[in-house]
Amino acid sequence: MDGTIKEALSVVSDDQSLFDSAYGAAAHLPKADMTASGSPDYGQPHKINPLPPQQEWINQPVRVNVKREYDHMNGSRESPVDCSVSKCNKLVGGGEANPMNYNSYMDEKNGPPPPNMTTNERRVIVPADPTLWTQEHVRQWLEWAIKEYGLMEIDTSFFQNMDGKELCKMNKEDFLRATSAYNTEVLLSHLSYLRESSLLAYNTTSHTDQSSRLNVKEDPSYDSVRRGAWNNNMNSGLNKSPLLGGSQTMGKNTEQRPQPDPYQILGPTSSRLANPGSGQIQLWQFLLELLSDSANASCITWEGTNGEFKMTDPDEVARRWGERKSKPNMNYDKLSRALRYYYDKNIMTKVHGKRYAYKFDFHGIAQALQPHPTETSMYKYPSDISYMPSYHAHQQKVNFVPSHPSSMPVTSSSFFGAASQYWTSPTAGIYPNPSVPRHPNTHVPSHLGSYY
């Protein structure tokens, strides 16, 4: 019976794998797989060949992995991983529809993300550089910040018809006109962080490939890391200390940058200027004396390193100034009126919009400490000024011009012999010179004698 079947198969087919036992073991596994898969044409020999017809698939290691995955699928044509469906069909089937599936998979991989992904938020993300924002970008950013951080009581009409350049020019006082102090810190901090992040992105991508595919792959992760890092800093920064200048700690390298200590920077200058020397201390010097020591921060403290300070307890400052000047009735009203005297002298100014806040002008202080022009002449010619009174006192002592002319001794030379030289000299003869004849030493002693 078996011999009859082999003979019949040898007549209708030239493929030895159908009747030769030597090929049975090699073809057993593909036959079982294809039978289990329920294919209607599994018996055709050209459908069983596991090798792809194209040469480019032979040397790729992906064929082995996909083949193993295919062997363990238990006859199923659907892979448990979506990204493996097209690869498996490409290697096994060899049909015309399979290359289309593979190409569609690659297009889907390199194309934009679907709407239901978490990166859908990128559709409302504005350009990285806030100075390039349009009015619509400013509106989107403001709406996003309100929803993201739960900000309330913001006058959105204040930001209408405002582009990115105008937004970046706003300072803290401008934001306070549209919202509260807390919202101002949040908006200013995030705006400053975006500007620094744009500089970081420009520096890292200026010498790299700018293709669109790299941008699609890198932008979602960069945006998520940037927003996550800023959120962490906001949660820690707003609970610890107020932000200075709209930027808390983020630098160009996304590392925390500590704020400089104003007491270390301004401390030596404050101590030097606060020392009045032998004279009485002035009010502005007294304030610098308090600011030179951080232990006085409970009543007066620096606000940054630009000379701005604030009286946290103005009554205590006035009380200490009253003790120094022995004025027990001193209060802040009297002290503030005394401070106005320094405005015209450019020693300090009042910070507008802030209570009990002032700012020292160190350049004006340096000019105020310069010696007066009349005082400089006292030190420019000290010998001449000290010489003249001594010279006249010397004349009175030696009685150079007596009351009676007869008492004046007469020498062999005429006393007025050199009168013409005396009055025609360049110095008008105010001081004696060697050309004028002198009397004996008993009457006109030398000016360098015992009287000096």
UniProtKB/Swiss-Prot annotation:
Residue(s) carrying Phosphoserine: 39
GO annotations of cellular component type: cytosol; nuclear body; nucleoplasm; nucleus
Keyword terms: Activator, DNA-binding, Nucleus, Phosphoprotein, Proto-oncogene, Transcription, Transcription regulation
SMART domains: ETS, SAM_PNT
Localization terms from the record: Nucleus
Subunit record text: Can form homodimers or heterodimers with ETV6/TEL1.
Pathological condition linked to this protein in its record: Involved in erythroleukemia induction by Friend murine leukemia virus (F-MULV).
Function: Sequence-specific transcriptional activator. Recognizes the DNA sequence 5'-C[CA]GGAAGT-3'.
Name of the molecule in the record: Friend leukemia integration 1 transcription factor
Organism the protein comes from: Mus musculus
